UniProtKB/Swiss-Prot annotation:
GO terms for biological process: translation. One of its GO terms (cellular component) is ribosome. NCBIfam families: PRK04219.1. This is Large ribosomal subunit protein uL5. The lineage of its organism: Archaea, Methanobacteriati, Methanobacteriota, Stenosarchaea group, Methanomicrobia.
Length: 165
């Protein structure tokens, strides 16, 4: 009941513009994650970057279950199983980035496509979180049942042999 597990992994690529570059990023993400990405849109207009509100500027995929665990293992190997303590939030979630998609197995550099980086966000939880999400008789999650930063670090060290600096 107190064991920490991965709820979901969100992989995000921010391209900054729509068009051909975004389509290339979507194809790369589909190859890496084996799922179809959805487009993320700009929340506000940024005239300095020629970005309009509502314009598609990136893509993302949410992974759960076994695919999420496999993706995390591969991603942590790419960053040499090292995560900094500042990459954790107070709820035990953590995020890290990968600078080049070519680091993934089976991916190679193509001058027609270029190089894309990605952000990986991992949400950790314990069993019993359903009481906050269910439709009837919602309740607040007890403090002892919440995942804390220290719990997340211990989970990563135990399950994935990650070094936290």
């Amino acid at each position: 009941m107190r064991d920490v597990h991965i709820d979901k992994v969100v992989v995000h690529m921010g391209v900054g513009e729509s068009g051909e570059k975004l389509v290339k990023a979507e194809n790369i993400m589909k190859t890496i994650t084996k799922q179809t990405p959805i487009r993320s849109v700009a929340k506000m207009t940024q005239p300095a970057f020629n970005i309009r509100k509502g314009a598609p500027i990136g893509c993302k995929v949410t992974l759960r279950g076994k695919p999420a665990e496999d993706f995390i293992k591969t991603s942590l190997n790419i960053v040499n199983k090292t995560i900094f303590e500042s990459q954790f939030d107070k709820s035990g979630n953590f995020s890290f980035g990968i600078e080049e998609h070519t680091d993934f197995p089976g991916m190679s550099y193509d001058p027609q496509i270029g190089i894309f980086g990605m952000d990986i966000n991992v949400v950790l939880e314990r069993n019993g979180i359903r009481i906050t999400r269910r439709r009837m008789q919602k309740k607040k999650l007890p403090e002892k049942q919440r995942v804390k930063k220290e719990d997340a670090i211990a989970f990563l060290k135990k399950e994935y042999s990650v070094e936290v600096r």
